[in-house]
Amino acid sequence: MFPRVAFLGQYPVPSKDLPLTFISLEEWTLVRLHGPDVIQCLHNQFTCDIQNLNKHKYSFAAHCNPKGKMISNLYVFHLKNQEMAFIERLNICKKQIEEMKKYMVFSNVTVIPDYNAILIGIAGTNARNHLSMFFSVLPNKTHTIIHTQDVTLLYLSSPSERFLLIINKKSVLDYLLNESQSQIQFNDSRQWVSLDMEAGYPIIEPITSELFIPQAVNMDILDGISFNKGCYIGQESIARIKYRGYNKQTLYRLNGVMDYKKNYNLPAAGDQVELKINNQHWKNVGIVLQSCQIKKDNIWVQVVLNRSILEPSELRITNTQTHDNLMFYY
């Protein structure tokens, strides 16, 4: 197994200010699935329509428990005949695969986490122009995934154009790095996390797994749920919430300012979000999914909040020192 690639980290930068950057995605992993039953198996478990998934596109998807609560979210796509794959957070991969295998006893499908696959993000100024020096064809809004001999490229349009590369040979990565060294910056997965937060892509950790329905974390907005396909795990609860209007939670990104000279603890997944009531009391209204420090003195926090909250409101995060005046917006 290759050692996981991790570039030296620095403070993440908002997409509008991001120079051309290579980003190591050491917090994500690739999972391969192959066998004659692979399409039907995933179709019966994931929220998206696997049977009608275009081979030139990937889809956002959620894997849920029988109650419709999301175990994890992922990108799923075709690799080649009778082989599919998905990308998800590394720290939830083991749990998610174990849950998936419970319903695969009679399916002819093999599931293999591919820890040798190298995942790299490329984002920032002129990312497409730079990649075009190495690849004759790049993915776009119409064809969101492209396969070459040693690299698969995924296109993401939000918050600005960026690319996710699945590299099968270390020598290919070395070549890209050697040829790009003078033109790019490097960062670790925190930069990709911040871009996902800007884009409204939920980041589910083990502690927040199985807490939310997919609609509470934008999976319907991201076209990660099909309401026209046949039965899948959790479908009854997910459909009921859509058609009866029961979704009382939604995804937000909070913005806060901190004194970078002090030794703060960033909000952590699972921390509680509280709303100030009548300028004196605090009420629990949500849960933290993820946070990151932007540049030196800004904090972004991805949270799930009750829909009943009015904007703007004064919020704080419990169990941390960074809990004052976090104003929320989409």
Swiss-Prot record:
GO terms for cellular component: cytoplasm
Keywords assigned: Cytoplasm, Folate-binding, tRNA processing
Family: Belongs to the tRNA-modifying YgfZ family.
HAMAP family: tRNA_modifying_YgfZ
Signal peptide residues on this chain, from the entry's feature table: none
Role description: Folate-binding protein involved in regulating the level of ATP-DnaA and in the modification of some tRNAs. It is probably a key factor in regulatory networks that act via tRNA modification, such as initiation of chromosomal replication.
GO molecular function: folic acid binding
Location in or out of the cell: Cytoplasm
Protein's name in the database: tRNA-modifying protein YgfZ
InterPro entries membership: GCV_T_N (IPR006222), GcvT/YgfZ_C (IPR029043), tRNA-modifying_YgfZ (IPR023758), YgfZ/GcvT (IPR045179), YgfZ/GcvT_CS (IPR017703), YgfZ_barrel (IPR048451)
Main localization, broad class: cytoplasm
Any GO BP: RNA modification
Annotated binding of folate, by residue: 28, 192
Any Pfam family the entry gives: GCV_T
